[in-house]
Each structure stands twice: as structure tokens, then as C-alpha cells.
């Protein structure tokens, strides 16, 4: 299973992103491939929140278009919503305690815990994920 961080979703969609070409190509391959994609709600919510924000984008995506994009991802046969399970709280709190992170990295710890709990790889362009022990993650913009 591959779990995408919100920055992967944004870069795959935003043609003006410096990582768009590489990540969009990778994302299309993943969506059309055999690997299961676990889409967490936090990544979907973040995508819609950010891509529609006029303070971030000069020409923000409309809410309707952002929803259509998210629905198109969820309609793929290899995509499923991934949710916290019974071990999530222990893994999540353990990551916070062992790394000393919180604040802006709290959501990153949540995503790391999801990936660890589900035996998944996390896809992100954010190097902050390197600080979480036992997390398997990669940057699809540089993955060969």
C-alpha cells in the first residue's frame, strides 16, 4: 500500500508546481497500477483546503473541480480510504514521544502512524518524514 501526503496530491494536480511533471507521471502510473493506494481523509481534506485557497493560488481551483478530482481518485479500483485502526493511537503517541515533535509536524506524525500501522509506504516531498523511526517513505519526485 502507498499512502500519499497532501503535497503529493497538490503537486500531481498543480501544473505550475516545480515537481508537477515527475509526480503527475508517477501518480498516473500508481493509479493505473496494481499497488493499493490508501488515501487518508487528512490528505483529501488538505488537498481541497489548499488548492481552493486564493491566498495560496492566484487562480484557485473551484470547490466543485477539487471535489471532482478527489472523486476521480477514489473511483480508481486500487484506491481505498485508509483509516486509523486499533493500534493507531499507540503508534501515533509513540512517534510524538520518541521524536519530540508536535506543532506543525503533528499531522506528519499521524500520517507516519497510518503508514506504519498498515505496513504501507508513505509518498511525500517533505523530508521531515525522515525523522520517524520505522516509517518507510519515499519522495516520488526523485524516485527512479
Predicted regions and their residues:
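Short, well-structured N-terminal submotif of metal-dependent ribonuclease cores
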Residues: 1-39, 54-68, 144
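Acidic, PIN/NYN-like endoribonuclease modules and their adjacent C-terminal/linker elements
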Residues: 1, 112-144
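Structured helix-beta-strand junction loops
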Residues: 33-34, 76-77, 118, 132
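Acidic active-site catalytic centers that drive phospho-/nucleotidyl reactions
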Residues: 5, 108, 126
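Short beta-strand segments at enzyme active-site cores
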Residues: 38-41, 82, 125
Amino acid at each position: 500500500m502507498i499512502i500519499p501526503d497532501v503535497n503529493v496530491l497538490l503537486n500531481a494536480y498543480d501544473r505550475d508546481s516545480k515537481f508537477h511533471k515527475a509526480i503527475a507521471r508517477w501518480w498516473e502510473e500508481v493509479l493505473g497500477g496494481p499497488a493499493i493506494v490508501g488515501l487518508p481523509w487528512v490528505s483529501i481534506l488538505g488537498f481541497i483546503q489548499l488548492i481552493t485557497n486564493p491566498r495560496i493560488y492566484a487562480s484557485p481551483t473551484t470547490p466543485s473541480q477539487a471535489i471532482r478530482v478527489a472523486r476521480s481518485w477514489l473511483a480508481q479500483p486500487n484506491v481505498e480510504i485508509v483509516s486509523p485502526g486499533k493500534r493507531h493511537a499507540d503508534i501515533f503517541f509513540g512517534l510524538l514521544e520518541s521524536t519530540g515533535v508536535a506543532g506543525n509536524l503533528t499531522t506528519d506524525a499521524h500520517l507516519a502512524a497510518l503508514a506504519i500501522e498498515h505496513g504501507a509506504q508513505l509518498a511525500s516531498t517533505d523530508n521531515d518524514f525522515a525523522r520517524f523511526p520505522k516509517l518507510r517513505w519515499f519522495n516520488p519526485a526523485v524516485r527512479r
